[in-house]
């Protein structure tokens, strides 16, 4: 793990360090970035370029303490900066067709990154919640992993279009 100091506020063209670290930054301005975080940031920027509209970040990197407070799972990809909860302003985030459409774009981007063979075998993940979506990268599954948690209970792999 490395600590880096950034000049300016952006991690990528469209994502800022404030979005990345919200409430988790050290008081001296340091942020925790893992090697796989760079892969995730690259994938996010490719996704953002493809969709052509702003993504509003609820949560990206989490410390263990913050993750516990907000009810995150023990091995959350947020702990490595490899997951982001986000939404589109003014859009219905409960629309399954839109979720599937955007999750498929995310899946395609991760597949392209895997074709480069630079980062090992990673898989994408996408979750649907009330009011926001979760996108991430992971290596615990051999395929794109997705879920629906809008009811408050997680239903794994519910969308046949994403299998």
What are these regions (language model features)?
Residues 1-48, 130, 138-142, 146-163:
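Extracytoplasmic cell-surface/polysaccharide-interacting catalytic and binding patches
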Residues 19, 65, 70, 74, ...:
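Solvent-exposed, flexible loop/coil residues
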Residues 40-43, 66, 82, 95, ...:
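Amphipathic alpha-helical interface surfaces
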Residues 75, 80, 88-163:
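Catalytic cores and adjacent binding grooves of peptidoglycan-active enzymes
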């Amino acid at each position: 793990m490395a600590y880096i100091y950034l000049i300016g506020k952006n991690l990528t063209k469209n994502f800022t360090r404030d979005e990345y670290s919200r409430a988790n930054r050290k008081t001296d301005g340091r942020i925790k970035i893992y090697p796989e975080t760079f892969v995730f940031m690259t994938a996010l920027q490719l996704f953002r370029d493809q969709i052509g509209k702003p993504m509003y970040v609820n949560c990206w990197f989490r410390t263990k303490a913050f993750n516990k407070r907000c009810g995150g799972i023990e091995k959350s990809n947020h702990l490595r900066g490899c997951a982001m909860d986000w939404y589109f302003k003014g859009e219905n985030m409960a629309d399954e067709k839109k979720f599937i459409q955007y999750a498929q774009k995310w899946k395609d981007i991760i597949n392209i990154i895997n074709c480069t063979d630079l980062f090992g075998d990673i898989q994408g993940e996408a979750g649907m919640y009330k009011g926001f979506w979760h996108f991430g990268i992971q290596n615990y599954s051999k395929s794109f992993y997705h879920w629906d948690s809008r009811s408050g209970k997680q239903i794994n792999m519910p969308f046949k279009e994403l299998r």
